[in-house]
């Protein structure tokens, strides 16, 4: 722990550690935060969400606090002995997210956390700490909601906007509309007759889990060879993603082509996988009282399947699956500069509700 420096006349000190460990205060060891510290961290995240109208940490960073094998690194900033801010580094990006309690903002705590992250950069192989103030360190800082304080903090340290991610939402009135005039139903009806949609569970039962996973990974990596987070997956990365508490194999919809004999158990007759729609269904809040929220989590198409309207049809099929499982509404994330995708989602009834900015520093 460093001596207590002063940033903008607000005394604070920084604690850094490799892994916080499980959020539950009942499960602790030497590498994990104390129960009191966890309560303070959870308070920061809760109050930030309530104040800003958007959560400061994405799912990957929340998992990084619970799962040591993700190897996330954390810095905590304390004022008067209490944690008032947290920064997290995901080495796979590398990417950063941070949060400061709303009552302690504009006091230099975000700057203190950013300095701690900069000091950690050399251990990630991102350059010498003495040079990073002028040359940058190659980290991506995600500012959720693109709020003015975050934008000001980013500009203060010389960061530049690199990506913008839109959150789009389909209201419950559209999700639950079963009429033929529903744009979702109309899009689902365009699925070609020679394409069969099966869940991962159904597919694995027919052709074996290993063959299905291999086909899924091949399409994923072909579809996202350009993507910094979704591309280049292997079996270990897929297994890691499936450890999320909300994961349901029935919610992974796979689009199979018509070639090949589809006898049960005959893995040699695996037909070509044209694409997939990985849906997500979770609850708002931290308990079972919140509404179910559906998400168009990942959609990927093989190159040979592109240009056939399968993206639109598979999106609609996934929304129908989420609706059948009582989703109150459906959301998705899309790159702001992907105009064709944004227009396609708008045609289904989605509207933009949030903007998230990735800053390079």
From Swiss-Prot:
Its EC number is 2.3.1.189. NCBIfam families: mycothiol_MshD (TIGR03448). Monomer. Acetyl-CoA 2 binds at residues 299-301, 306-312, 338-343. Belongs to the acetyltransferase family. MshD subfamily. The gene is mshD. This is Mycothiol acetyltransferase. Residues 25-173, 195-361 form the N-acetyltransferase domain. InterPro entries: Acyl_CoA_acyltransferase, GNAT_dom, MshD_Acetyltransferase, Mycothiol_AcTrfase. One of its GO terms (biological process) is mycothiol biosynthetic process.
């Amino acid at each position: 722990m460093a001596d207590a420096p002063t940033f903008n006349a607000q005394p604070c000190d920084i604690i850094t550690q490799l892994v916080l460990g499980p959020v539950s205060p009942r499960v602790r060891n030497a590498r994990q935060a104390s129960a009191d510290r966890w309560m303070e961290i959870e308070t920061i995240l809760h109050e930030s969400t309530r104040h800003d109208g958007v959560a400061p940490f994405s799912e990957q960073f929340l998992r990084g606090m619970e799962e040591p094998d993700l190897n996330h690194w954390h810095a905590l900033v304390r004022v008067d002995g209490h944690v008032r801010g947290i920064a997290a580094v995901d080495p796979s990006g590398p990417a950063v997210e941070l949060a400061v309690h709303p009552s302690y903002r504009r006091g230099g705590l975000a700057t203190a956390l950013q300095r701690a992250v900069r000091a950690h950069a050399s251990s990630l192989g991102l350059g010498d700490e003495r040079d990073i103030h002028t040359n940058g360190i190659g980290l991506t800082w995600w500012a959720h909601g693109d709020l003015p304080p975050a934008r000001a903090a980013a500009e203060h340290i010389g960061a530049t906007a690199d990506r913008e991610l839109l959150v789009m939402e389909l209201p419950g009135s559209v999700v639950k509309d079963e009429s033929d005039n529903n744009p979702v139903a109309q899009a689902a009806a365009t699925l070609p007759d020679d394409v069969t949609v099966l869940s991962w569970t159904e597919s694995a039962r027919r052709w074996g889990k290993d063959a299905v996973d291999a086909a899924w990974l091949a399409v994923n990596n072909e579809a996202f060879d350009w993507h910094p987070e979704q591309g280049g997956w292997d079996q270990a990365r897929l297994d890691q993603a499936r450890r999320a508490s909300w994961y349901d194999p029935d919610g992974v919809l796979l689009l199979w082509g018509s070639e090949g004999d589809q006898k049960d158990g005959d893995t040699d007759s695996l037909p070509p996988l044209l694409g997939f729609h990985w849906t997500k269904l979770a609850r708002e809040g931290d308990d079972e009282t919140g509404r179910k929220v559906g998400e168009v989590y990942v959609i990927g198409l093989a190159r040979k399947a592109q240009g056939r309207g399968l993206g639109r049809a598979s999106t609609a099929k996934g929304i129908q699956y989420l609706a059948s499982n009582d989703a109150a509404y459906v959301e998705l994330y899309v790159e702001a500069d992907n105009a064709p995708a944004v227009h396609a989602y708008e045609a289904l009834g989605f509207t933009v509700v949030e903007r998230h900015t990735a800053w390079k520093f």
